[in-house]
Amino acid sequence: IKKAKGEVEDFGGTVIVKAVDYGNVEQTLAAMNKLKEAGIKGLVLMPINDKRVLQKIDQFTEEYGISVVTVNADVEDTKRICFVGQNSVQSGRAAAGLMHDILREEEGTIAVISGIETNTSLSDRIYGFCDEMKKISPKTEILDTKYCFEDDLIAAHLTESILNRYEDLSAIYITCHGEKGVCD
């Protein structure tokens, strides 16, 4: 972010960075309001798929005339001008193909650990992974997704709980930060 900020400022632009706690809707809305009050002309946002945030994006574009670009996670049903990021469904499909190649099993059990439900990028990865695994390994059981809020300690507790319950677990698919907690 610092590098991109510097590049924009080299061209005479001004960049204001407002960090919020991951998944915190209230902080996101407050930051958006403060940025509007600061007179911004455009907003780059990693959105949360929450009705209030989606409405605020539309308000920014329609009422305030502030262009909004979403990054990393998309919210298609808004007035944002574009999305910059990966095809998360395809990323999930690719992960399923790699998982299948690594496991080389016709059946097994796979746990899924993700960040938060309201991050569309993460939920799209899960969808792509599960959909592809059903096609290429229909006998593989995919457990219900558990959420670690991208926290290593929570991820570690979830992993321990999963391993205690499923002694024959084949793999864990993790879509977010928290990998240290899963692997340690």
Language-model features: where?
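Amphipathic helical "hinge" segments at domain boundaries
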Residues: 1-30
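Short, ordered loop/turn segments at secondary-structure junctions
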Residues: 20, 48, 72-75, 115
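Flexible loop/hinge segments that line or gate small-molecule binding clefts
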Residues: 51-90
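Short helix-capping segments at alpha-helix termini
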Residues: 7-11, 63-64, 133-140, 165-167
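Short, surface-exposed alpha-helical segments at coil->helix boundaries
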Residues: 29, 89, 93, 122-130
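Hydrophobic alpha-helical
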Residues: 41-61, 129, 143-184
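Short beta-strand segments enriched in small/hydrophobic residues
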Residues: 2, 81-82, 109-118
